[in-house]
């Protein structure tokens, strides 16, 4: 059965950049590259906001990627640790670790689903990604559209409900949220 995923919102553009071509995009705006049987024209990017992961962990040419991250006017990074992308950022927004927030984890191809209870208060001014993006959305007058009027626990409950419904349709019986969360 399919586990819940956060809504990605409506794409206002019909183009995308393969993550493996981020350096090309930043270093060669306007260039055309082949991708998946199509030609993709790389846009000019003035701002990069990187949250969730570290591109330096999986890029083929770290020196080239490092040079690429120096090109945009502004680089913002949300992260729990001061990793290489943070060193190249103009703004680093400290994000909570999995120990400092409530969450739940599920294996993509197996049956494992586990609650992840917050074990410690966030260090210094760290905030979870949801709160960081909700604060930014608020500055643009879009908080309600972004949060759908849910906080961290509201989203956890909502995502559990979707997953539980999907499981039921697949012939599996998952417990009510209260039982799962305890």
Question: Over which residues does each language-model region extend?
Answer:
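Short beta-alpha connecting loops at secondary-structure transitions
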Residues: 96, 111-122
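Flexible, acidic/glycine-enriched loop-and-adjacent beta/alpha segments
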Residues: 93
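Catalytic, metal-anchored helix/loop core of enzyme active sites in primary metabolism
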Residues: 90
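Generic structural signal for well-ordered, non-membrane alpha-helical segments
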Residues: 41, 62, 113, 125-133
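Glycine-centered secondary-structure boundary/capping sites
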Residues: 40, 111-112, 137, 141
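N-terminal leader/propeptide and maturation segments of large enzyme subunits in energy/redox metabolism
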Residues: 1-12, 119-182
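Extended redox/cofactor-interaction regions of prokaryotic respiratory oxidoreductases
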Residues: 1-87, 97-104, 170-182
